[in-house]
C-alpha cells in the first residue's frame, strides 16, 4: 500500500521522533527497523538541525561514558535528516540516462532489485518538510540539464518530472509499502520554481492513481494552492479527509493562537486585522510593536530576552537599503548555523543583533523575540501593496562621464510579487513570544545643491507602510 499524507509543518511529534532516533543511534543503540527519513530542500534548516542534534547527542553520549566525536555524530544524524538533493541524486543514479520518450526507468545494470525494497531506497517513510516548496518540472529539468548549480553533478537531459512526481516515483519503486508525509504551510512559497502543493495532487492524478491520499479539510482553503486544490482532488481516486492532520493552534507563536490570523489579515488588507490585534492586546498574549528607530528595537529585544531566550534581526532578501541601520546580512549555511546556535557570548550569535538573516535562512526555524526590518521593497499604497527592486545602472552625466544611477524599480511580475509578499509572511511569523517591526524613517536631508542625500531612502517610500501598520493599532516604541 502506498500513502500520501498531508500535515501541518509545526507537528512536534515529527521532530521529537527524529531526535529520539538520532539519540539512540548516536549512543550505540541500533534500530534495524528504522525506516524513515526527514527530507528538506532547505539547506540552512538541514545544516542547523544536523549541527544541533550532533552537538546534543555528542554531549549525551559523553555523559554516558561513550566516546563519540562530532564528525561521527554528524554522519549518523545525516542518515535520518537529509537535504532532498542527496536523496534525489541517489535515485537518479539508478535510472537510464538519457531519458527516452519522457519515461523514467530503472537501469538494471546500475541498481540491484531486492525482495522488499525493490529498486527504491531503504526507507519506508519519507517525511518531506515544506512540501509546497518542491520544484516545478521546469526548474528541476533545467537544474539537471546543466548538471546542478555549478555543472559538477550528474547531468540528466530531458528530465520529464517535477520534484514531487519524482519523489512519489522513487517511493513507488518499493515492492512492499511506502508512505510520504508532506508537511505544508499556506502562503509560504518564496522562491521562483516552487510548485506549491497542487503539484503533488497533479502527479497522483496523472501517474499514481493506486496511491491513497489522506489530508485535512483545511487544505482546500484559499491560502493552499490558491484555493484550487479541491478541483484537483475531484480527479483523485482515493482521498480520505481527517481533521487530525491539521494543526489548528500555532505552536510557533504559542502565546497567541490568533496571531497567524492577524498576519494573514494584515497582508491581505482584511478589515478584521484591527479587531484581531485588539483581542491579542486585550489578553496581553503577544507583544507586537512598531518603531522607526532600529536602536529602540535592539534595546527592546535585549530587555525582553531572559536566560537562553534567543533574539535576532530579520530582513527580506529583496531588501537593499539596510546598511545605514548598521545591519549585515549573512550568507552561507555555516554562518547561519553559528547565527542560530551560538550563545550570547559569541559575536556570531543572532543575539548580538548585528547580523540579520533572510526568509531563505529562517524558513522552518524561529526565535523567541525578533525584529523584522521592513524595507522599501514592499510598500503600502492606500489599500494595496506595491513591489520594488533596487536597480543599479550607469548613466551618462552632463560631465561626460558614466555615473551609477541607483533607484527603486517597480516589480511587475505577478509571481515575483507573490514571493515578495510571502517573504514578509514568513518573517512576521518567526517569533515565538514577541515581535517588533522596524520601518525606517528614511533620509530627508538635502545636499548643498538641493538634491536628496539618498534618493533610495526617501521618507515617502516608508511612510505609507508605517501609517498602515499604525492604523491597525500597533503600539510604537
What are these regions (language model features)?
Residues 127-231, 382:
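Signature of the SF2 helicase/ATPase Hel1-core->accessory helical subdomain module
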Residues 52-60, 140-147, 193-204, 227-233, ...:
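Short secondary-structure boundary/capping segments
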Residues 190-196, 205, 216-383, 414:
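Conserved helicase/translocase motor-coupling segment
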Residues 34-52:
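Conserved Walker A/P-loop ATP-binding site and its immediately adjacent core
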Residues 176-179, 352-476:
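C-terminal accessory regions
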Residues 56, 68-171, 354-358:
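Conserved RecA-like ASCE ATPase "motif II neighborhood" in helicase/translocase motors
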Residues 3-23, 28-32:
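Post-Walker A helix-loop "phosphate-sensing" segment adjacent to the P-loop in P-loop NTPases
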Residues 2-8, 44-48, 56, 133-136, ...:
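Flexible loop/turn segments at secondary-structure boundaries
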